[in-house]
């Protein structure tokens, strides 16, 4: 064995090596010749030349051993010349004898313990190899280090490589192989990695310069006692098990899922989170790893708030403004402008504007009659009605009067239904019974048939077969809807609409160009004249019949016009004409001075949309516009008035029909009474007589027919009569017997 020790006398700048086989030692001086250093046996060395005079008791370097004390000259074990004869060991010498450099030189290789430990290097590679002979003789890279024992070489063949451990192989530039049989590989470029479908990238140190290996393909090692590495996006430190455990704990804990901070639930690794929407307002879609959230085209929400606006299932409410809820519409005392004309029909729910409301008021006033009218400011002056010579100022009161009269009529009808009959109204026939086959139809007379819905058939053999048709008279026929056949043998034909006619190249439109039915007073080859026709109204909208005197007046007017055409042509207003003589759609008025505008005076009120208006109409229009603006109400009022209009139209239309029908029937009844009262029979015994009579009351006429019989003894008298008025027939019978 060899050992290295420093004498306790002085730990100076020299070393002494004893291999354990010599009694003396191998020694050397230090650079400044302070003293020799060697084995020391405890005796103080004398001051002689070999101790350089520094071994005296007074010297600060006292107790430094002498050559003799280190073995003595007799043994020749510690002599300076030993270096010339020594072959089995390395000698360390200073420069006191001028035989060696000032540094330690170990030669090309160092072998310790008979070669079991060696140290070698290469001058060319500047590498170092420490270990067994196999390691020392193995290949080496530039500036590499190989440390290893055993029969298998530890090789650091890569430049700047390090191999430590038996058979360790560091074959790549800058690589490190640590441990038994560890081998290195080329470094791998790791830009990213995919774990469970998740791509991780942007790694620090993703492009390593070399590798450190602590094993091989089959031999693996654990690295223990690793300090915790820095954990950051730029860190390239190794991490230990505790750090990975913390990551594992965190990963295993997953993450928490809450909704509005409530209902917390854990989502762990491997769990699936399903995204869904129950109300359909969100449309969720997934493409690859992307989840898209979109609003549905039709949102379904319970309520919605936007600023001061609130919308829910009850409707829309604007704070301090309008609202539209299931309870109705509240305009919030604000005006609604630019409302287009809404449809005004039985089924319409459109909003209407002020102009429509004004027209409604005007229409209501017209239908109310009784001098009702609309003022310029839109207000309505109520009507006054006269029912049976009594005046009423309200519809309610008028209805009361009508109801009173209807009650009287109902009493009369009740008497008829009860078999009491009507005075002076009788019927006599031995023919087939009448048949009212249509819904709400009336049939009167022998073999009279009313088969159309709402039809009326009166007279022997009369036929009313179409909807709303009326056949009045013997064998009268009304096969066309809403048509009337008047008189015996009369027959209606298909309705023909006459839109207008052209006179002298000018086309004229006719009113009543959409007739709903026709009235026939005869048939082909059996025509009738209509006499006693009252003069009808003559206007652009009139549909009244005109009589002969009116046509005569027209003829006279035409003759007068023809006489004055020539003279009037000089002063007439004419159309401008094209160069070919055809008329233009313009007129140029010119008086005595062509430079002075012409004033049109006494201009009538325009009627149609293209008629000229006069100043009065213009002022009225402006006044109406202002009145409409003042009368404009909110949406609720409009709807209410719209409903009131429809209701009023319906009720007043029905009322008008009932009143007219009641008035006509009352007058007809009076006429029938007069006609029946005028019948006279022969009172002579055994006589059968026939009578005819007529009656007229307030524009309604009636005809009565009757048969009378007086017995031979004049005790028994009987009669049978029938009367007609306005297409309605009545029958009556009477019988008397004298007992004494």
Swiss-Prot record:
Q: What is the protein's given name?
A: Autotransporter adhesin BtaE
Q: Which UniProt keywords apply?
A: Cell adhesion, Cell outer membrane, Membrane, Protein transport, Signal, Transmembrane, Transmembrane beta strand, Transport, Virulence
What does this protein's UniProt record list under function?
Binds to hyaluronic acid and epithelial cells, and is required for full virulence in the mouse model.
Domain of life assignment: Bacteria
- The membrane-spanning stretches of this chain are 686-696, 700-710, 719-725, 728-739
Q: Region entry Outer membrane translocation of the passenger domain: which residue ranges? A: 648-686
Q: Which Pfam families match?
A: YadA_anchor, YadA_head, YadA_stalk
Q: Where is the stretch described as Surface exposed passenger domain?
A: 12-647
| Species of origin | Brucella suis biovar 1 (strain 1330)
Compartment list = Cell surface; Cell outer membrane
| Entry's family note | Belongs to the autotransporter-2 (AT-2) (TC 1.B.40) family.
Q: Which InterPro entries match?
A: Adhesin_Head_dom, Coiled_stalk_dom, Pilin-like, Serralysin-like_metalloprot_C, YadA_C
What is known about its subunit structure? Homotrimer.
Which GO cellular component terms, listed alphabetically, does the Swiss-Prot or TrEMBL entry include? Answer: cell outer membrane; cell surface
Q: What is its main location?
A: other
The annotated consequence of gene deletion is:
Deletion mutant exhibits a reduction in the adhesion to HeLa and A549 epithelial cells compared with the wild-type strain. Shows an attenuated phenotype in the mouse model.
Q: Where is this region: Translocator domain?
A: 687-740
Signal peptide positions are 1-11
